Amino acid sequence: MGIAGLAIGFMEVLKRLFEQHFHSPVERVQPLQGQLGGSGRKIIRLSTEKLSAIGILYDVREENVAFLEFSRHFRRHGLPVPEIYAEDLSHGAYLEEDLGSTTLFELLSDQRSGASVAPEAVAAYRKVVAVLPRFQVEAGRDLNYKVCYPRAGFDRQSIAWDLNYFKYYFLRLAGIPFNEQALEDDFSRLTKFLLSASRDYFLYRDFQSRNIMLRKILNEDQPFFLDYQGGRKGALQYDIASLLYDAKADLPHDLRQQLLDHYLDSLAAFVALDRSLFMQYYYAYVYVRIMQALGAYGFRGFYERKEHFLQSVPYALKNLRWLLHNVELPIALPTLMEAFKSMVASEKLQGLTSEPEQLTVRVFSFSFHRGLPQDETGNGGGFVFDGRSLPNPGREERFKTLTGKDAPVIDYLNQQESVRQFLADAKSLVDASVSTYRHRGFKHLMVSFGCTGGQHRSVYLAEELAKHLRAKDGVEVVVRHREQEQLNQ
């Protein structure tokens, strides 16, 4: 059932939870689509002028229970996860803290220049890997593993599910040849080796850049964490491997090594760490995490025909290529390694790098006093948003010489619920057009934000939309601040 098809009764459940918690009626409801990739959960932002929360609708009770219990447990340990405001498990609904809309992946994509990673993104990653041991060790010590779903531990059964997922939904559907029995023998050897590592810690399971939110606190990006409902007891190596070999993040190897070292330094404060023993198992867990991800890409992309999932495959193959050339595991897995070599050499899989025609989205800020920006492409498609109804920083003396790109103005506008809702609505409308334009092969879309002077609100809105769009595949974003450019000429 899609967002649009949500039964009125279920939406009313979320509204009731909001009103009971905040003692205020809901004024706006904003479905958030695509936030959780392949998940079946429905995510809705409910808000008033000053209040906001995220409502979740999901019909797998065991997974809901795991998320709710883990969230409360982690908060008791002082970890940065959303507060749970209210729940109604009989309807598969709960209400949680709104952590905003900026993920670690969006920051990485927005600040990126070619292969290099911006200092702001590196700093955020360092904070993330420093917090991870607190989840794994500190909070993992007294966690109630009985509520884990679908397994209490990353055990033989869990590993078998992941390996078979990879075999049947990726290798088979991608047409990679292999000897079934020989591959099963390698799977058995790999499983035995993985299970010989210490597995007495919390394994987050989906510890990757799209599940980490960033919020500005004292003008610095601070990480908050989501999507740990699949967590269970397991080895330390799995989660750091998930983060550093997150396919679309495409982190350079030298940065991966720096972050791994920083993680191990942080981990040493919580456990008696034998680094050589940790590294003995590390790359085996990297391989198994990559296989799990490829199985997911194959299931969503090859089987369900959701082709955008396949755009991550070339990045995963790049990781495999590096591993094949630089890492030798302590165990022999000849058939599996041959399958990997066939994958990285496959013309079919290499062809997945040919993405649809790129769409260029031109985002303008402007002053209504000077008229609308002109569409120089001749396409004529897009939006003009009027931001004059929003709170105006230009009326305050402290902001008069600043623009919507300056931190004090950004912080001021970020705190305005009306601005957040306006921006969420604009993103939703533009996202729908971007999807349609790409599907139909259009090359240009224009989005303009206007305000009184073209200095504060319109500049801020244009920058925020551009940051959001840069995280999308096959979209080039060009930002123009018309009035500011004319002032600087």
Give the residues covered by each predicted segment.
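Active-site acidic catalytic loop and adjacent metal/ATP-binding pocket
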Residues: 40-46, 190-238, 250
